[in-house]
């Protein structure tokens, strides 16, 4: 197939859970593109698995070397946090299929870099009330909860994933994550049909 499945959706829509389930799903054989970030590691996250954690200096070195495919920067209440995708030796589309999590903006840049025929968008959505509750539950479980940042992210997602931006990115198929098992089944079928 040689495709990149790009999971997108607002924070706490279930992307991380679906991502992990897709990687474990036996018939798809997806590998992961691990993104990079300058934000602090969260409780339970693993460097090189969830993200490649770096600092601003590391980001600038990758930028100068021309390896950054796409990047987003967020002025958080804790400072500037960057998230970015790097063209490194781990991406071998001629040999493998991949799965990654990104924003609409990231999807557009990935599509431009690799070609539209190589990138399969999977947009996950959920009721905002449920999403806010999930975000709160996740933040409560952190050693040092960052509630102010959680609220900022929730509100920013309403703009970053506006209906106009979803349509402008060319997203035609959406997956409602009301129940994980049925949502996951629909996504697996969608990937299999679009190989």
Spans of model-derived segments:
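ATP-dependent small-molecule kinase phosphotransfer cores
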Residues: 37-98, 102-104
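Hydrophobic anchor at the beta1->P-loop junction of P-loop NTPases
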Residues: 7
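P-loop (Walker A) phosphate-binding loop of NTP-binding proteins
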Residues: 10
């Amino acid at each position: 197939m040689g495709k990149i499945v790009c999971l997108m959706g607002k924070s706490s829509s279930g992307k991380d859970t679906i991502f992990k389930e897709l990687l474990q799903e036996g018939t798809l054989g997806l590998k992961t593109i691990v993104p990079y970030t300058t934000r602090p590691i969260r409780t339970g996250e693993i460097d090189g698995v969830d993200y490649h954690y770096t600092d601003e200096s590391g980001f600038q070195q990758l930028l100068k070397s021309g390896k950054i495919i796409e990047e987003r920067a967020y002025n958080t209440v804790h400072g500037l946090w960057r998230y970015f995708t790097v063209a490194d030796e781990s991406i071998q589309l001629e040999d493998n299929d991949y799965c990654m999590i990104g924003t609409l903006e990231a999807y557009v840049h990935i599509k431009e870099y690799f070609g539209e025929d190589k990138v399969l968008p999977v947009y996950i959505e959920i009721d905002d009330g449920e999403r806010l509750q999930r975000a709160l539950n996740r933040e409560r479980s952190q050693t040092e909860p960052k509630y102010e940042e959680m609220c900022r992210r929730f509100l920013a997602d309403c703009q970053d994933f506006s209906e106009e931006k979803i349509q402008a990115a060319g997203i035609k198929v959406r997956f409602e994550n009301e129940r994980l098992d049925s949502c996951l089944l629909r996504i697996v079928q969608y990937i299999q049909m679009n190989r």
